[in-house]
Amino acid sequence: AENFYRTGQREESLQKLSRILERNPDNRRAEVLYALQTVAQNPAKAKELVNNIEPVGFIGEMAEAVRVLSQFSQTRINSEEKSEAAQHVNASVMAFRSGLVEKAFQESIEAFRVDKDFMDGKIRQILAALLIYSGEESRLAEKYRKEILSVL
C-alpha cells in the first residue's frame, strides 16, 4: 500500500489499505495513510483519524499533512477579498476538493508567488502538504518539488 502511495497510485493504495484496516483496525500507519489519501473527499473524517498523532517522524509528518489539508479544503476566502492571491487560493481549494491535484499545486504556487504572506504564510504549509499528499515518488511530486523550490 505504501509503495502505491509513494508512486501516486491512489486507488490501488486505498484498496490495499481498506483490506489491511479490515483485518487490523489498530494499524496506525495504515490508518494515517488512509486518512492522507481520503482527506480531499472527507476532510473532517480524515482529520479525526489523525487527531491524536504527534507531528514526529514519517507517520507524524503524514498526520500533519492531513491536518493542514483538512483545514485547507474547508477554506473559504471572504468573497469581499479581491486580491489575486485570494483568487488563486479559492481556485486551489476547489481543484483539491475535485481531485485535481495538479491544478491545486499550480494555483497554490501562483498564490505564493503573488503574496508570500497571504493567509499568514500558510501557503508554504499547504504546498508541503500537497507534496506529501501526492506521493513522494509520484510524477506530480517530482514536477512540483522543483517548481516549489524555485519560488521559495
Per-region residue spans from a language model:
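Canonical positions in the second alpha-helix
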Residues: 20, 52-53, 111
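Residue-level signature for tetratricopeptide repeat
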Residues: 3, 20, 35-37, 94-98, ...
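TPR-adjacent "capping" and linker segments in tetratricopeptide-repeat scaffold/adaptor proteins
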Residues: 18-23, 70-87
